[in-house]
Amino acid sequence: ADTMRRFQDTMESSYFFMQSRQLDDFLVLNYIQEHIDTVTLTEISKHFGFSLSYCSKLIKNTTGMGFNDWKKALRIRKGERLLVNTTDTISSISLSLGYENTETFIRIFKKETGMTPGQYRKQSQQNLQ
């Protein structure tokens, strides 16, 4: 009976640990999305009280990507949505995503999607017609 109780306690501890890890994952990834324009790994670790190493591993284990690659992917996805769903200028979209200048946004967007933001918007509008 004592062995069963210890086993049950261990299982409950493992369960709560896993739940806690999943919550950490969710909170960190949500924070990145909400602060995509300015977020840094240092800021995340300070905000949650986690070490840089823990934050980095959490992001990598959850997304399969390092922080910078994940941030870039999120920025591009958000840029795609803004290009399709708003009439905001490419310059204002670039700034809202935290790019220092429009040229950098255009270059990275083209590298990731194969077309410029303007081409992407135009093609998306044609596909909707």
Predicted regions: what they are:
Residues 11, 15, 113, 117, ...:
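C-terminal alpha-helix/helix-terminus motif
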